[in-house]
Amino acid sequence: MVTWANFLSQLFNGLASGALLALISSGLTIIYGALGVLNLAHGAMFMLGGYAGYVAYQATGSFAAAVLAGALSLVLVGGALERTIIRHFYARPPEDQLLVTFGIGIVIVELVRLAFGSLSLSVPPPAFAAGVTPMGFMIYPTYRLLVLGIAAIALALLYVVLYRTRLGTIVRAGIEDSTMVGMLGINVDRVFMTVFGIGAMAAGFAGIINAPVVSLTPDVGESILVQTFVVVVIGGVGSFPGAILGGLIAGEILSLTSMIDPAYSQVMLFAVMTLVLLLRPQGLLGLQSRE
């Protein structure tokens, strides 16, 4: 029997996981929106952020240092990958872009497996968030509330960068017409490298704040990648607000349906995605198709 306490707990679980999915998906949609590249290595970057944070935590014992390492290391990795590999595929067919990012993801996963093995690792939450918080007639894990807050702040910061800064104006202009941006004398290569780094950072940041919730393994990014693509399709490819809306919808679907039968959670998520594709192919808040 489902009680109100159980229902509200699952509702908050959905918000927390939805905010995390929104953060990951925002990185993917920023990369696709500005560069036109569907990054199949995004799940591996999520995983790599978790492991980078794990290394930092083992070295310092500080969760804050782990979070910084998970985010900043992926800025560097993303920028380096864009500069050395990805930029050579912008003019190539989409299937080539998919293959190269898929290959990058496999290389990252296997390098991590070689370095750390396949056994699960964990990063403990900060001491102040290790317990539970009373919330009326239920108690809820404090760290999950922290995840919700951190993800919301990160999404707000990304929104400010995209909609309140010169870089954001250039990125959004590139989403509409990247050729025009180049004609204005802007260093498109540098902007594209920055965009890919920001997108990778969003995945890495999500990876480390998720590490105290779900144990780290080299394959942890696989299911996240699938869910992220579903979120992007539901919200709208290339739409930052759509990534947030899609993430929250997906999080609640996965959480609430698990009360009935966890086996149906993924089925319901894909059913909703199919319904959105039938009724609104561009997604709930999607942009028009790229030319």
Language-model-detected regions and their locations in the chain:
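Membrane-interfacial amphipathic/re-entrant helices at transmembrane-helix boundaries
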Residues: 1-23, 52, 63-66, 92-98, ...
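Membrane-embedded helix boundary and interhelical linker motif in transport proteins
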Residues: 12, 34-80, 84, 89, ...
